[in-house]
């Protein structure tokens, strides 16, 4: 699948980095050292999650990004070592600087295949913004859900059938209009493409909201477990340790709730944007219908006029027509005779 993006399509998001949890035998001092941190990252969302981390065929790449500005094109891919493939459950998946530091890598971007997201390093992000670069991303996906959009309706893509070993190429759907000639030298585009009516970003926005809600639910469950442990013990040292752990978890909860609220705000903005896109598509469809209706009315009037003229000609009385023709011929002959005498 090939998706096209602009520099303005990159989101700035916050993620909570935390390993705060109950561990048997930990002291109050050790729990006090546990701290949730918020990292700011730069993210690109693909139109799908649960993408593939392996090539579908031996001849394609798992992930590649082509950056274009001016006459310059730069490639960032798994093959050239500039992009790492990670899971959203991997440590520091959303903190590329920390990931490179811990793993001894030097990636400029992380492809989180199961989340369908790309986290950019600061250098690559700065390059895209400074150059106002456009870029395209190629990736693979081999499992589709019933609710997933059909990629060939939105993107240039290649489909590979693992049974028949047949490869089908789908061109970029942009400009695939169906035009009908509705009158002399007048054509009308009758179709509205799905990509012009239904924005794919709404699906991914909902995925993100679902994920951050899950993060909040998870920390709430950890707090509830700690409260149960506090209620079931009479050891004052353990109560103090668990109290410190609970405080740390509550701090993490506040951070995650803050991020969840931001996600809700993004969601409302996205809903308004998608609604506006759909309204424009509906309005254009209505305008097409009105133009077609006007053309139909005009052609209907022309048909009526033509049929009336034809009827007048066909329904004329033969005797009257002969008399009229004879009179016209006599007048013509008299005119010729008079002209000849004058000359």
Language-model regions: role of each:
Residues 1-2, 244-343:
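Amphipathic alpha-helical polymerization modules
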Residues 2-101, 143-160:
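Extended beta-strand solenoid/passenger and fiber regions
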